[in-house]
Design a protein with these regions (language model features):
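Oxyanion-binding "anion nests"
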Residues: 66-120
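Flexible, glycine/charged-enriched surface loops at secondary-structure junctions
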Residues: 58-59, 72, 93-101, 121-124, ...
Length: 189
């Protein structure tokens, strides 16, 4: 879950939402069991992302969870929020590059999301697809081992996050959306 109300009000995106700036963040883990399964799973894309970029031991905890139970331990939620807050705190003005870690899967995911017809793809589903693409690129260009990539893909599959785009979208439209992203420069993400 990305933030306090964000898990429930995904359509009400708050410009400039920043967990570090909040005076109080209230989290009710019991509310998760009231969500439709698909919405619960798509919120997991953010938890998965934070574990992948900053807390590999958390991946073991996530592998042990049963997605059908729709329960996440409060300490896991707190640790997840802390990861995001620490990254933002380290690079509040986005000048060091550290904060770019939070974009893992988002650049390509947002391009897919903006190309799809509104309502056909949940935000977390698009991010999951973007993460898969980022894992592929990280294996090819950044030294991520195939074993690490496979582990992360298995976890996405365990949580029933999409790994394959089952919509017919134009590659040209996705590339056009990608080119509009601020993180895309000189033809690279």
């Amino acid at each position: 879950a990305e933030g306090n109300l964000d898990v429930i009000l995904r359509s009400e995106r708050f410009a400039g939402h920043d967990p570090l700036k909040a005076r109080l963040v209230l989290v009710d883990p019991e509310a998760l069991i009231t969500l439709p399964a698909k919405v619960f799973r798509e919120g997991f894309a953010e938890i998965f992302k934070h574990a992948a970029i900053r807390d590999r031991p958390m991946l073991t905890d996530l592998e042990a969870l049963d997605p059908t139970q729709q329960r996440v331990a409060p300490d896991l939620i707190a640790a997840n929020l802390s990861i995001k807050a620490r990254i933002v705190e380290e690079d509040e003005k986005e000048t060091l590059g550290t904060r770019a870690l939070l974009n893992f899967g988002h650049t390509i995911g947002h391009a897919i999301e903006s190309t799809a017809e509104y309502g056909t793809l949940l935000h977390g589903e698009a991010i999951s697809l973007g993460i898969r693409a980022a894992l592929y690129l990280s294996t090819k260009k950044c030294g991520l081992t195939p074993e690490e990539s496979s582990r992360l893909l298995r976890l996405q599959e365990q949580w029933q996050l999409p790994l394959v785009l089952d919509l017919e979208l134009s590659t040209n439209d996705i590339m056009t959306a990608l080119a509009r992203d601020k993180k895309f420069s000189a033809g690279e993400v």
